[in-house]
Amino acid sequence: MKQLLFFCIITIFSICFCQFAAAQNNGVKKETQTLALGDSTVKINIYERKGARVTFVSPHHNEQIAVRLGREAIEKTGGRFVEIESLDENGNGQRRLNFSFKGVNYSLDPNRIFTENGRQCSQFAPEIEPLVKDFGERLLKIILADGARLREGERFLVAIHNNRDVDEQTELAQKSRDLTALGFSAGFAAMNLSQTEFHHQTEGVYLSNSEYDADNFVFVSTPALMSFFIAEGFNVVLQKPAAKLQIKNCAVDDGSLSVFAGLRNIPYINLEADAKFGEFRQRQMINAIYRLFYQQQRGLQQAKMKK
């Protein structure tokens, strides 16, 4: 009898604990897929919860504000967050993926592998390039349906990034390579001003009087998306259309997820924020993403009702 009572108590405790754990993560399911890269493996963590049909992607694991806010967004509002896990020897998040093949160590930027031209620009050894291509294609199949289109119910793909504070850069050459809204402006480049390294990729730039930090901006693939985020008060950068991205130039096609999406006419949004001071602003960007999703969803429903 005592054994039966003890068993019942343990069972009740286990059920309560499971219910508590489920409540703690608010229904967020975490799945980890392991992808081979040479003789090494890379963990891809996928957080998902019912709600808005939005996929967020964090390619760089050292950008911890982006990683934290991506998980937070899924927990609060739903959707899906894909995180590429990359840790150094101390267990800290790092930007690049380190891997080995046949006893030789290599390293790559996971956001420079999605196009053939981008992989060529990274100058991988001939025996490594097919391995990187295969890894990139399998990663895309996690992010997108069949690795080439939005998943059912989704309206756009969202990347989340953090960048280094441009004000911390002292040398002019360093400032020119810093990722800011100004860095995408061809007009500033024509005037030989600093911070214009990335203007080859863009069609236009909008600078908002509501934005206090040039490191905070939204990068979009279509004019319609640009209009929405302008109205929201953000700095906005518009990527070149697909026809203008088909140039075998590393300054244009760098192998990034944005270029891959642009070449395939996949609506794409990148939320960039200062790695030190951009948390509040990036959270506002994520909230705007959900407003955009539900706005587009309502528009789609209204269009169906009119038919």
Would you name each region that the model predicts?
Residues 24-306:
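Structured catalytic-domain cores with a bias toward divalent-metal coordination
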Residues 7-16:
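Bacterial N-terminal signal peptides
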Residues 18-23:
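Boundary at the C-terminal end of the N-terminal hydrophobic targeting segment
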